[in-house]
């Protein structure tokens, strides 16, 4: 990339093609630039990507975009000092892309009173552009049976980088557990969208016995085993919630790729996936 003007033009073109904002495309590109540094670092086996950034890679930027990167750490201490040291070392890995990264700050992530990990703020610098980025780092996640080596396809080059990642069964299991256990208290419509889009675009890759095992492991870790048994009633309660429908309508307005999908369709995706697991005794 010769200069920022050239990069901006490419980002605008991609934004038009994918129907998402140029800023969001740019953030995804810069997160990818960070990920290449991870792949070349001594921490490549410790840093396991998950969440929206990984889902976006699986289904395409035109079907899912995100503003941050979620990862879980394995085989390395997850304290504030250790995480900061790891990220700062990753940022020094030489890559021929003329982008430099600045570590800004790190802080605990809390959901209520519960500590869930660390949030790291970075800036990706490609003068005169300075793009703010966010990494959410956790540890102790239950990956069933284990993380995989994932070929991440680059946005602007015809090549892949190899990184460690959640497998599809665990991604889907965590999403299913979240939407069912949180019922109509879930404030994140994207969780429903992710179940919908993964079951549509990755249908041929879903291993239902593996998904059942991953869902049982996730539910056991989160203490939601009994709640998941009531999935039919919970999905219907969610389907009939005016608040949840309003949240979904707002999500559809914000993201063009969700604009034609009804709330009933995403609820159906959750229910039918669970039906398949229960009917075949893959989850009990």
State where each predicted segment sits.
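Structured mid-to-C-terminal alpha-helical surface segments
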Residues: 1-47, 56-65, 69-284
